[in-house]
Curated annotation (Swiss-Prot):
Family: Belongs to the AEP1 family.
Location in or out of the cell: Mitochondrion
MF terms (GO), sorted A to Z: translation regulator activity
A GO cellular-component term linked to this record: mitochondrion
Keyword Mitochondrion: yes
Lineage of source species: Eukaryota, Fungi, Dikarya, Ascomycota, Saccharomycotina
First and last residues of the transit peptide: 1-34
Role noted for this protein: Required for translation of the mitochondrial OLI1 transcript encoding subunit 9 of mitochondrial ATP synthase.
Native organism: Vanderwaltozyma polyspora (strain ATCC 22028 / DSM 70294 / BCRC 21397 / CBS 2163 / NBRC 10782 / NRRL Y-8283 / UCD 57-17)
Main location: mitochondrion
Protein name stated in the entry: ATPase expression protein 1, mitochondrial
Alphabetized UniProt keyword annotations: Mitochondrion, Transit peptide, Translation regulation
Keyword Translocase: no
Length: 432
């Protein structure tokens, strides 16, 4: 880390407080500064200052800054934010002097390094190969089950249906207490053999919710039933409409209360959570998707590329619908914990998303530095040549900076590709 190398140049003996100040009028005046930016408020998913940037920052006497002091850092204000509605804004990072840079950089790097890991596990997941349980029940052995089957066949998911279903189910369980017939066995049998429509699934899901406090007493049992529901949804290609999604979320919410936990789904296995993540993405529930994906990332369990790309597509849809003016800011917020994924991925499409959402060449350089460390860097960067050139031009604010940044980009291309820069990329490069 460059901190230890440059500390002696820009750190006084008694540094007790770190400050990054945002100028409002005169950058040289104390009145021109407002509340310091805490590094933990910065939610940039992939920007890290390089050693050269850190050295330059600590060597600049007058108004040292990151990313040229431009307001391109995505900030989340924790005191004004909720998990569903974060308060986001762009800010610039400019210091009044070199005095407090080192402690600030230490904190900034610590926050980001503590979540970094070279170890990661890609979930080997196929939705139609979920670990379901084979039911051993039959109507021949349990003829009273036919009543439940008949109710299912005629249901529309209404209150009367669920009431009658519950009466019959409880009656069967009471009569069969001596045979150790468990309620989860009945649910699994019905889901596997008779739940063929969304109204039927809604009815059974509501019934499972009602029995969380009477029969389903372990999270592992609930996970078995959730697996059956998820397998059914994926195999039948059910559309997750609002009623079905609310019913399913109601089940999980009741499970949180039952098992006295913030989120019972976090206790599921990685394969179950990934299947559930697919469900949330298909239902375009971006907040639940972000929450569950964040849990997987924190466990160093990364979904397959196709699921990550589906999540990124969902972000683009949601951001466009909600606030096109601050699209990049919101996209970075929804991917604020993606550093390890970006650092480890070899998929150009994932990296393209972050290139397109860069607002400064330093951000582009961060992506390029990650690619540079990969063995197959040539295969990764080739499909991105045009995107990198065009984005470099768009984030450069003058002819001089455009020329300088394109020269730097050319150096990256030469290192990674040698003379094998794609013809189309050469043509675009020459035109710029």
């Amino acid at each position: 880390m460059v901190i230890s190398k440059v500390a002696s140049k820009c750190s006084p003996k008694n540094v007790t407080q770190s400050m990054v100040l945002v100028p409002s009028r005169n950058i040289a005046s104390r009145k021109g500064f407002v509340k310091p930016i805490d590094p933990k408020e910065i939610i940039h998913p992939f920007y890290r200052p390089s050693q050269i940037e850190e050295f330059t920052l600590c060597s600049t006497e007058r108004n040292p800054s990151l990313m040229d002091g431009k307001p391109v850092f995505p900030i989340s204000l924790p005191l004004l934010s909720t998990s569903v509605l974060p308060q986001l804004l762009y800010k610039k990072i400019i210091f009044p002097s070199v005095r407090n840079i080192v402690p600030w950089l230490k904190k900034f790097n610590y926050i980001r390094i503590k979540n970094y890991s070279d170890e990661y596990y890609t979930i080997d997941f196929k939705p139609l190969e979920m670990p379901t349980v084979e039911s051993k029940l039959t109507i021949t052995n349990f003829p009273e089950l036919k009543i439940l089957v008949d109710l299912l066949e005629n249901t529309n998911g209404g209150r009367t249906d669920i009431h009658n279903f519950e009466l019959c189910l409880n009656n069967i369980l009471q009569k069969r207490m001596s045979t150790r017939l468990f309620v989860e066995d009945i649910y699994i049998y019905l889901i596997q053999n008779y739940v063929t429509t969304i109204p039927k699934l809604i009815l059974v899901t509501k019934s499972i919710k009602n029995h969380l406090n009477n029969g389903i007493d372990h999270l592992s049992i609930l996970e078995k039933l959730v697996n059956e529901i998820l397998y059914l949804v994926h195999s039948k290609k059910f559309t997750m409409d609002l009623v079905l999604m609310n019913t399913f979320n109601g089940l999980l919410k009741e499970a949180d209360n039952k098992f006295n936990t913030h989120s019972s789904k976090f206790g599921f296995s990685e394969t179950t959570k990934e299947s559930l993540l697919m469900l949330y993405i298909q239902a375009e529930d971006i907040h639940s998707s972000k929450e569950l994906l964040g849990n997987l990332i924190s466990k160093k369990s990364y979904p397959k590329d196709e699921i990550i790309l589906a999540y990124l597509d969902l972000i683009n849809k949601a951001v466009y619908k909600s606030n096109p003016e601050n699209a990049i800011l919101q996209r970075l917020s929804y991917t604020s914990n993606f550093f390890n994924i970006i650092n480890h991925t070899t998929n150009p499409e994932i990296l393209r998303f972050f290139i397109h959402n860069s607002r400064h060449f330093k951000e582009i350089q961060c992506v390029l530095d990650m690619i540079l460390k990969k063995k197959n860097r040539k295969d990764i960067v080739l499909p991105l040549c045009i995107d990198l050139i065009e984005k470099t031009v768009s984030v450069s604010d003058s002819a001089v900076s455009t020329s300088l940044n394109l020269t730097r980009l050319s150096d990256y291309f030469e290192t990674m590709l040698g003379m094998n820069v794609r013809i189309e990329a050469k043509e675009v490069f020459m035109k710029k």
